[in-house]
Amino acid sequence: MCTHTEPSRSFYAELQALERGAVTSLSFTPGFPAADFPECGPLVFGYGTDAGQLSRGVDALYERVVLNERDWSIEFLSASEAVVEAMRLSRAGGRPVVIADTQDNPGAGAASNSTGLIHALVAHRAQRAAVGLFWDPQAVNVAHEAGTGASVELVLGAASGHPFAGRFVVESLSTGRCHCDGPMLKGATVELGLTTCLRIDDVRIVVTSTRVQMMDRAFYRVAGVVPEEMKILVNKSSVHFRADFEPIAQAVLVAKSDGHMAADPADLPWTALGNGMRVSPGGRPFENTKRATDSASRCA
C-alpha cells in the first residue's frame, strides 16, 4: 500500500489535521507483513501533553481504520490480466502504463528473476514494452561476449523455476554505472554491475549482474531504454519506483505474478502472530495452534 494512493492519502491528511494543540504527534503503522512475530500488525499511537485530547485523536484514527478496513485491500491482477489492461490503456497513446511486478521486488527479498510478466508480454504481442531490472548474471555475460547487435539463444531466469527461453537481440551493453536524478535517489551514482538490454519481438528486458530494485528512470536509460517512449513499463518494485515513475505514467497497475515475496499477507505462512489478528484486511483471524498446544502442555 502506497501513501500516495487511497485510502492512505486521505487517512494521513486526517492524521495531520488532528496534530494540533496538545497533540504533538500521531502515527499509523500499517505493519510490515514480512515479519512474523506476535506484535506484527497495524498500530495507531501518538504523543502529546494532554491525555484526553491525545486519546480522542488516536481513537478517531483507530475507528476510521476499523470501519473502512476492507478499503485497505489491494487489487492484484494476474500477469496476463495486467498486460491486457496495460495494452488497452496504452492504445490511447501518450504516457506509458506502469506495471508493478510486486512479488519479484528485490527490495523485499525477492530474486528479481521471475519471468511471468515476460511470458505474458510476449504471448500478448505487447508493443514498446520494457522490463527492469531483471537479475541474470549468466545472461549478461553471454550478451557481453556476443556484442551489441548479436542474436543470442538464452534461457532467462533459469534459477527461478519458470524460465523463459528464446532468441534475443543484444540491443545495448553497459557497465551499469548510472547517475540518478529521481526524487528517491537524488543525484546518487548507482552501480548495477554489467548490464545489457535484450529484445525479443518488441519487448526489451534490462538485465543486470547486480540485484537492484527499479526505483529510478536512469536504470532504464543506462541500458539505452527511454522509459518515457515506452507504452508499457514492468518495474520489479512495489512502491519505491513511484516517486520517479508516477509523473510520467498514465496508470500504475499492480500484478501478482510469480515471485518469492507474497504481496497478499494472507498468502504468507504465519506461525507467530497474536491470536485474532486478521491476516489481511477483512480476512480470516489467525489462530496460533502451536501456542495453544504449548499452553495446554504446561497446564498438564
Language model: regions and residue ranges:
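Hard-cation-handling environments
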Residues: 1-202, 206-207
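Extended hydrophobic packing segments that form well-structured cores
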Residues: 44, 66, 182-300
